[in-house]
């Protein structure tokens, strides 16, 4: 199924960015071969040097876009330090892209606990065993840590580590991009002065 067959209406006429994103993500779930919720997450360190990596979007609504991670990882430390981040979704099958950026907040403990319980048991063990973004002596050292935590939590529920939780990006800018012939692409950006502000829509030159 082509992008044109999936598209209904002119997205540049939309005035609701979260609703438009939901529609595009739903279409990506049909056309993408795997992980339609994969997104490039950009952060910056204390020197202003950027870092980018792929993560998985685990939820979104009018409050923002949520993902989960180890707060002691590089991205965790950078977000806690700068309290800002950016994301870029790129769906090749649809020839579409969505970029967003804004301040970041930590999700509630209740949200983090609820999501953590949905993860595979092995993934919950991994959250304890992996000292993410730190030097690893060998694969054996990681597997040993996994075995130790597997034994520790052999019975009962596996608690969520205090250093593992979620972030919510509350965008002040969301841009929708769609490929067109001769690189004359369609671009629409929604902007607001703060996460509580009203959206303004601007059509952009490609």
Curated annotation (Swiss-Prot):
Q: What does this protein do?
A: Catalyzes the oxidation of either pyridoxine 5'-phosphate (PNP) or pyridoxamine 5'-phosphate (PMP) into pyridoxal 5'-phosphate (PLP).
Q: Which Gene3D superfamilies match?
A: Electron Transport, Fmn-binding Protein, Chain A (2.30.110.10)
Sorted alphabetically, the keyword list is: Flavoprotein, FMN, Oxidoreductase, Pyridoxine biosynthesis
Q: Which biological process terms from the Gene Ontology are attached to this UniProt entry?
A: pyridoxine biosynthetic process
Q: What is this protein called?
A: Pyridoxine/pyridoxamine 5'-phosphate oxidase
HAMAP family per the UniProt record, alphabetical: PdxH
The organism's place on the tree of life at top rank? Bacteria
Q: In which pathway does it act?
A: Cofactor metabolism; pyridoxal 5'-phosphate salvage; pyridoxal 5'-phosphate from pyridoxamine 5'-phosphate: step 1/1; Cofactor metabolism; pyridoxal 5'-phosphate salvage; pyridoxal 5'-phosphate from pyridoxine 5'-phosphate: step 1/1
Catalyzed chemical reaction(s): pyridoxamine 5'-phosphate + O2 + H2O = pyridoxal 5'-phosphate + H2O2 + NH4(+); pyridoxine 5'-phosphate + O2 = pyridoxal 5'-phosphate + H2O2
Cofactor(s) it depends on: FMN
The annotation note on the cofactor reads: Binds 1 FMN per subunit.
Tell me, how does this one assemble? Homodimer.
Task: State the EC number(s).
Answer: 1.4.3.5
Q: What class of enzyme is it?
A: oxidoreductase
